[in-house]
């Protein structure tokens, strides 16, 4: 099983795929999960809006849309990541672009692991998971 990276209508971000894949797999192990087929699909705001409208009936931009195909402890899914929104949010929150990109990637991975972020208590747990994961990619 593999973690794959592709783009739809955006330039590929300059991340080290090997390190990123190793990091994702380590986070999955931390949650007693295994990697199935996971695809990170980098796209524009226009594309994420189209996907959001078509599949979720939401008429708004977002930084990530996660489609979960997991079965049991084997984690599989597609992560559509809007690079325009990553750039916007990194400036808005005054954080490094790549830190924001990795936060969004792991946010999608945590969704695939069963994390939610609709309720305030769930958002707190999600943020804690993101922060723990980001510590690992920094080291």
From Swiss-Prot:
Zn(2+) binds at residues 107, 111, 117. InterPro entries: MetalPrtase_cat_dom_sf_prd (IPR023091), YbeY (IPR002036). Keywords: Cytoplasm, Endonuclease, Hydrolase, Metal-binding, Nuclease, Ribosome biogenesis, rRNA processing, Zinc. One of its GO terms (cellular component) is cytoplasm. It is found in: Cytoplasm. SUPFAM superfamilies: Metalloproteases ('zincins'), catalytic domain. Coiled coil: none annotated. Binds 1 zinc ion. One of its GO terms (biological process) is rRNA processing. Its EC number is 3.1.-.-. Gene3D superfamilies: Metalloproteases ('zincins'), catalytic domain (3.40.390.30). Belongs to the endoribonuclease YbeY family. This is Endoribonuclease YbeY. It comes from Azobacteroides pseudotrichonymphae genomovar. CFP2. The gene is ybeY.
């Amino acid at each position: 099983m593999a973690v794959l990276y592709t783009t739809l209508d955006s330039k590929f971000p300059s991340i080290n795929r090997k390190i990123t894949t190793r990091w994702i797999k380590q986070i999955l192990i931390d949650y007693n999960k295994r990697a199935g087929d996971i695809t990170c699909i980098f796209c524009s705001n226009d594309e994420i809006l189209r996907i959001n409208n078509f599949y979720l009936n939401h008429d708004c931009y977002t930084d990530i849309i996660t489609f979960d195909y997991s079965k049991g402890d084997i984690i599989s899914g597609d992560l559509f990541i809007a690079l325009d929104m990553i750039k916007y949010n990194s400036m808005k929150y005054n954080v490094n672009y790549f830190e924001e990109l990795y936060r969004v990637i792991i946010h999608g991975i945590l969704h695939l692991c069963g994390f939610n972020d609709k309720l305030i208590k769930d958002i707190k747990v999600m943020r804690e998971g993101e922060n723990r994961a980001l510590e690992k990619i920094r080291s």
